[in-house]
Amino acid sequence: MQIKEVDADSSIQAEEVNYYSEGHLCKGYIAYDAKMKGKLPVVIIVHEWWGLNEYARSRARRIAALGYFAFAADLFGDGKLGRDPEEARALTARYYAHPENTLKPIEDAITKAGDFPQADISKAGAMGYCFGGYVVVNAAKLGAPLKAVVSFHGRLVGVEAKKNLLRAKILICQGADDSLVPEADQVAFRKSMDSINADYTFISYPGAKHAYTNPEATELGQKFNMPIAYNAAADFASWEDMKLIFHTVLK
């Protein structure tokens, strides 16, 4: 099974929004169901290392269709995109080298979401893909005001978790055949989470490689000689697991 795209004639409203983070202009993207009454729980979405592209926007629309106010954040500023791994590596370097840099962009995205009358930022969650998964998990560990965080095939390195800072329930959706997230990193992550009795769930999807949620991953992997591939079954299963945690914690 595959995740159903939002129909063009649905009541989902979506638009690009400008906001500032650390003094830089960012071009985010919001989506929400105009038929929903009252304020909606917020889900911040962080893109892959390719940037806030149509894939990330489509996920925002799907989140909106579930009854959330979706805010796709722009972590590179000015809507920059990585056209190849070299550019993407340069755009993500400041975050991978200094994981503490992940906190402010998430806080700023939540603040901007709060400007919209449809958004209830007291019920905020976050999700991210690859690079984005790394970002949202580290931001949560640094104390971001999030109730639930979901990482899809994200790197599991970064800051050490501290019980007094981590407030979110965490879901890790990991591909069992992901060679870009070493087993040693997975073991270290679990050990760190267990050491503070963190509320987390770690799910491994059989046969899934890195970037398994992106329908373009197989083509990109072939183009750039990267060990990534789309896996429809894992994409669907992880989406269902994400839906459950957000419904349980945010609604």
Regions found by a protein language model. Give the residues of each.
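Serine-hydrolase catalytic machinery in alpha/beta-hydrolase-like enzymes
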Residues: 3-10, 16-116, 215-229
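Acidic catalytic loop of the alpha/beta-hydrolase fold
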Residues: 177-181, 210-211
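C-terminal catalytic histidine-bearing segment of alpha/beta-hydrolase fold enzymes
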Residues: 199-251
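Short alpha-helix in the alpha/beta-hydrolase fold that links the catalytic acid
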Residues: 59, 182-192
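Active-site loop/turn elements of alpha/beta-hydrolase fold enzymes
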Residues: 68, 75, 154, 205-207
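Primarily recognizes the serine-hydrolase "nucleophile elbow" in alpha/beta-hydrolase
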Residues: 106-167
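Short beta-strand/loop motif that positions the catalytic acidic residue
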Residues: 172-174, 178, 205
